[in-house]
């Protein structure tokens, strides 16, 4: 038995302007090659664009988009007796938010155009409305989990 204690879970810090953890999570996921100031620029421009498009609080749109994309359940590959099964597992809130952010950024990167701030703002607005590529990805994941419900006892 190990004498070592369990590691404490790190809490995400909030960003300097909006004092919001979700914004900081987005910044850390969009970050490439250590260019954090550029990541902040992209996020803040996207938030400004959301403000212009919807004329509502952009942080509530962001929260709504992430809540809409966050999956409740996912599938995990598990090897049982020589064959691999897709086993549905429940997802915690932190992991769900991380997945949602990853899907939102992936969907916005796939959008046509060159300006990432514009693409991200469009994807966030679409996700808040209940459409877009990230929402489709969530529904796909839920369908996979439902289809493989028979393997739920393999956990």
UniProtKB/Swiss-Prot annotation:
Location within or outside the cell: Plastid, Chloroplast
UniProt main location, coarse: plastid
Pfam families: Ribosomal_S7 (PF00177)
PROSITE patterns found in the cross-reference section: RIBOSOMAL_S7
A single BP term in Gene Ontology: translation
Gene Ontology, cellular component aspect: chloroplast; small ribosomal subunit
InterPro entries in UniProt: Ribosomal_uS7, Ribosomal_uS7_bac/org-type, Ribosomal_uS7_CS, Ribosomal_uS7_dom, Ribosomal_uS7_dom_sf
CDD domains: uS7_Chloroplast
Keyword list, A-Z: Chloroplast, Plastid, Ribonucleoprotein, Ribosomal protein, RNA-binding, rRNA-binding
Biological function: One of the primary rRNA binding proteins, it binds directly to 16S rRNA where it nucleates assembly of the head domain of the 30S subunit.
NCBIfam families tied to this protein: rpsG_bact
Record note on quaternary structure: Part of the 30S ribosomal subunit.
Protein name from the UniProt record: Small ribosomal subunit protein uS7c
Taxonomic lineage: Eukaryota, Viridiplantae, Streptophyta, Embryophyta, Tracheophyta
Gene (UniProt): rps7
């Amino acid at each position: 038995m190990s004498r070592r204690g369990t590691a404490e879970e790190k809490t995400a810090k909030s960003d300097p302007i909006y004092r919001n953890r979700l914004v900081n999570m987005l910044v850390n996921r969009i970050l490439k090659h250590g260019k954090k100031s550029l990541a902040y620029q992209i996020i803040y421009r996207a938030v400004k664009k959301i403000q212009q498009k919807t004329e509502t609080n952009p942080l509530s749109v962001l929260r709504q988009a992430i809540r809409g994309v966050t999956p409740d359940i996912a599938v995990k590959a598990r090897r049982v007796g020589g064959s691999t099964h897709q086993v549905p597992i429940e997802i915690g809130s932190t992991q769900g938010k991380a997945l949602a952010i990853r899907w939102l950024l992936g969907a916005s990167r796939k959008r046509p155009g060159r300006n990432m701030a514009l693409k991200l703002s469009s994807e966030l607005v679409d996700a808040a409305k209940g459409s877009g590529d990230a929402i489709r990805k969530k529904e796909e994941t839920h369908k996979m989990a439902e289809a493989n419900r028979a393997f739920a006892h393999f956990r």
